[in-house]
């Protein structure tokens, strides 16, 4: 048993620190990406092309789909033939840590499709559970095996200076690590991520089927500086959830003892829902969670991705699209802030941050 990453001097950098590259997965799952994923593939392509302007993109695509992916992307990416069950690189890819000598260590968490037998979203996730170790092997990076601890990359945010953000709704969900206490879960995070402090937010985004990942509700934009998904509509269930998160953040400090600057990022003014027109496009396997007409989707501008040269922000053809871009442009003056039409990713159950995973420099 190797020492914990913390004992070995590794830590998880912030997403806004320099990247070597980004990991993504080609979207092919028929129960996630309707109508053969055609619209999703166009959205993924726009995201990949934007990220690739400033860093390498590694794309996991099985041999059977390689020529299709190449028809969209040509030689813009590094293709790796690693099998997956779906395209959520944030949640199935490794969490890559660094030490002060610039060495990397890939953390391999257990993955159970956001809840396993309790409330997981599909039953066969065996390939997904191998993605982190197989990708690390392809990159020739050493692996820290954190299994059987269940965690997804979307459930954690790091400031690179010892602070980790999580939500209680996700990490304490009975479908993750039901036999561990909150204290044991926190200790595992600190040791595995080389961190000093975990901040437990009560909630994420309403009806987020990941049990409310933190990456949809709060994100670091700099040291001691965060954005928080917000609504002023007191009749929206999201209002009480965001308010509880705000109250906690206002009284908390980061690992260095600094209070947070908090920017409120509005959620879309119009609720994003699954329509009757979307439904015929999905093909489900047995035991897979199915969509229904009118289902509210967990749309949030906080699910942006910070690449080396750009910040990629979901857009929903909503009045708040530009508001979100303006706020984030002030947070990231040195990067191009790019709006990406994202409803076709949202229909799969996540957004831009959920399909990307940074590989630190």
Swiss-Prot record:
- Which residues are named in the active-site annotation? 354 (amidino-cysteine intermediate)
Known InterPro entries for this protein? Answer: Agmatine_deiminase, Peptidyl-Arg-deiminase_porph
Question: GO molecular function, one example?
Answer: agmatine deiminase activity
Species name for this entry? Streptococcus pneumoniae serotype 2 (strain D39 / NCTC 7466)
Catalysis performed (reactions): agmatine + H2O = N-carbamoylputrescine + NH4(+)
Please verify whether the record's keywords include S-adenosyl-L-methionine.
Answer: no
Major enzyme class: hydrolase
Similarity remark: Belongs to the agmatine deiminase family.
Lineage of the organism: Bacteria, Bacillati, Bacillota, Bacilli, Lactobacillales
- Stored SUPFAM superfamilies: Pentein
Protein name, entry field:
Putative agmatine deiminase
In terms of HAMAP family, this protein maps to: Agmatine_deimin
EC number(s) stated in the UniProt entry for this protein: 3.5.3.12
Q: Which GO terms describe its biological process?
A: putrescine biosynthetic process
Q: Which UniProt keywords apply?
A: Hydrolase
């Amino acid at each position: 048993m190797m020492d914990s990453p913390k004992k070995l001097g590794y830590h998880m950098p912030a997403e806004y620190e320099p990247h070597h590259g980004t990991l993504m997965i080609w979207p092919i799952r028929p129960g996630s990406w309707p109508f053969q994923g055609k619209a999703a593939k166009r959205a993924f392509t726009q995201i990949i092309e934007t990220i690739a302007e400033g860093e390498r993109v590694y794309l996991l695509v099985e041999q059977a789909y390689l020529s299709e992916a190449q028809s969209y992307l040509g030689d813009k990416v590094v293709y790796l033939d690693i099998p997956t069950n779906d395209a959520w690189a944030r949640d199935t890819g490794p969490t890559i840590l660094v030490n002060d000598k610039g060495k990397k260590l890939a953390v391999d968490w257990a993955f159970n499709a956001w809840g396993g037998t309790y409330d997981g979203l599909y039953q066969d996730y065996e390939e997904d559970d191998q993605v982190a170790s197989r990708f690390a092997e392809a990159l020739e990076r050493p692996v820290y095996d954190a299994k059987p601890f269940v965690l997804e990359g979307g459930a954690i945010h790091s400031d690179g200076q010892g602070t980790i953000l999580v939500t209680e709704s996700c990490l304490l969900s009975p479908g993750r690590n039901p036999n561990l206490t909150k204290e044991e879960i926190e200790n595992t995070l600190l040791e595995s991520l080389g961190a000093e402090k975990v901040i437990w937010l009560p909630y994420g985004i309403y009806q987020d089927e990941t049990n409310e990942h933190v990456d949809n509700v709060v994100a670091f934009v700099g040291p001691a500086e965060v954005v928080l998904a917000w609504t002023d509509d007191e009749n929206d269930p999201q209002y009480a959830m965001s308010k509880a998160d705000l109250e906690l953040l206002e009284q908390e400090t980061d690992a260095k003892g600094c209070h947070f600057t908090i920017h409120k990022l509005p959620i879309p003014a119009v609720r994003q829902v699954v329509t009757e027109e979307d439904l015929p496009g999905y093909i489900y396997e047995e035991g897979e969670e199915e969509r229904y007409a009118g289902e509210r989707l967990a749309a949030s501008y906080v699910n942006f991705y910070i690449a080396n040269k750009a910040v990629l922000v979901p857009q929903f053809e909503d009045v708040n699209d530009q508001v979100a871009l303006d706020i984030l442009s002030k947070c990231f003056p040195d990067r191009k802030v790019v709006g990406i039409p994202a409803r076709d990713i949202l229909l799969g159950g996540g957004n831009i941050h959920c399909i990307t995973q940074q590989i630190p420099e």
